[in-house]
């Protein structure tokens, strides 16, 4: 691999041109061994170009400075991007990463894919220092199939249409905490969906006979042959008793007095 240099800076970063000519390999050799140097540079170049995220151009019109109390002001200013709904940290006044100060200064002086390349290098150096694998592609995922193998065709619910066990349960609708969710099963072979099976009522002859016998005894002990209670009389109308008098509107003529 040819030597990698950071040489493209913006016009307002002329003060960092001395750092731009620094060989990346000479800088990285201060932190990592030569055995991990080539792999780290190759990985950082690949990931920085593949997962590069374009920075959002912020202006004063869409940035709102948040206010903090003096007891919470620890030297870090926060900005809120109201247009893009983002909150991020900027202008750190507390010195961080003093061990990697040279590399951090290069990150601050660059932009674009070169900045992402240096950030990946810094991340990889820290992982190597801690003895952790920095390349996520080399990390083996833990298989929990022995414990949570819920999609095993051996135990799946068979499809009533094609009798296949290549089915998947899906939660269609969630409801309140005291109500069961709406669950449907989808068959991957015939592309049909069906309701989950329900438990059938288990009937035991002995239990049924015993319950019927108990019900007979209860009806013999407590017969319900008593006559119904008499109907209560209808309440008297308040108008008939003179409790409510007829009213009239003020625009109407007053009622004539009975002589």
UniProtKB/Swiss-Prot annotation:
GO terms for molecular function: DNA binding; DNA-directed RNA polymerase activity; zinc ion binding. A zinc finger (TFIIS-type) spans 155-195. Induction: Expressed in the early phase of the viral replicative cycle. It comes from the Viruses. Keywords: DNA-directed RNA polymerase, Early protein, Host cytoplasm, Metal-binding, Nucleotidyltransferase, Transcription, Transferase, Virion, Zinc, Zinc-finger. Zn(2+) binds at residues 159, 162, 187, 190. It is found in: Virion; Host cytoplasm. Gene3D superfamilies: 2.20.25.10. Residues 226-236 have a biased composition (Pro residues). InterPro entries: RNA_pol_30_chordopoxvir-type, RNA_pol_30_chordopoxvir-type_N, Znf_TFIIS. The keyword Zinc-finger applies. GO terms for cellular component: DNA-directed RNA polymerase complex; host cell cytoplasm; virion component. The keyword Zinc-finger applies. It catalyses: RNA(n) + a ribonucleoside 5'-triphosphate = RNA(n+1) + diphosphate. Its EC number is 2.7.7.6. One of its GO terms (biological process) is DNA-templated transcription. Residues 214-259 are annotated as: Disordered. Part of the DNA-dependent RNA polymerase which catalyzes the transcription of viral DNA into RNA using the four ribonucleoside triphosphates as substrates. Responsible for the transcription of early, intermediate and late genes. DNA-dependent RNA polymerase associates with the early transcription factor (ETF), itself composed of OPG118/D6 and OPG134/A8, thereby allowing the early genes transcription. Late transcription, and probably also intermediate transcription, require newly synthesized RNA polymerase. The DNA-dependent RNA polymerase (vRNAP) consists of eight subunits encoded by early viral genes and termed according to their apparent molecular masses Rpo147, Rpo132, Rpo35, Rpo30, Rpo22, Rpo19, Rpo18, and Rpo7. The same holoenzyme, with the addition of the transcription-specificity factor RAP94, is used for early gene expression. Belongs to the poxviridae DNA-directed RNA polymerase 30 kDa subunit family. This is DNA-directed RNA polymerase 30 kDa polypeptide. It comes from Vaccinia virus (strain Ankara). The gene is OPG066.
């Amino acid at each position: 691999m040819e030597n990698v240099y950071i040489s493209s800076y913006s016009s307002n970063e002329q003060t960092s041109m001395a750092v731009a000519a620094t060989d990346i390999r000479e800088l990285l050799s201060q932190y990592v061994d030569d055995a991990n140097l080539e792999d780290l540079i190759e990985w950082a170049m690949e990931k920085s170009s593949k997962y590069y995220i374009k920075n959002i151009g912020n202006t004063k019109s869409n940035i709102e400075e948040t206010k903090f109390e003096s007891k919470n002001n620890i030297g870090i200013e926060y900005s809120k991007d109201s247009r893009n709904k983002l909150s991020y940290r900027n202008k750190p006044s507390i010195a961080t990463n003093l061990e990697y100060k040279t590399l951090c200064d290069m990150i601050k002086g660059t932009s674009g894919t070169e900045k992402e390349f240096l950030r990946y290098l810094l991340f990889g150096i820290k992982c190597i220092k801690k003895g952790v694998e920095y390349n996520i592609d080399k990390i083996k995922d833990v298989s929990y199939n022995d414990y949570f193998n819920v999609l095993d065709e051996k135990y799946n619910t068979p499809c009533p249409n094609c009798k296949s066990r290549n089915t998947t349960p899906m939660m269609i609708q969630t409801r309140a905490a005291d109500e069961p969710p709406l669950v449907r099963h989808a068959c991957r072979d015939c592309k049909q969906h069906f309701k989950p099976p329900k438990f059938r009522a288990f009937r035991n002859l002995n239990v049924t006979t015993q319950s019927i016998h108990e019900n007979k005894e209860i009806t013999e002990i407590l017969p319900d042959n008593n006559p119904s209670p008499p109907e209560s009389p209808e309440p008297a109308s308040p108008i008939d008793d003179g409790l409510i008098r007829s009213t009239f509107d003020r625009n109407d003529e007053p009622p004539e007095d009975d002589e």
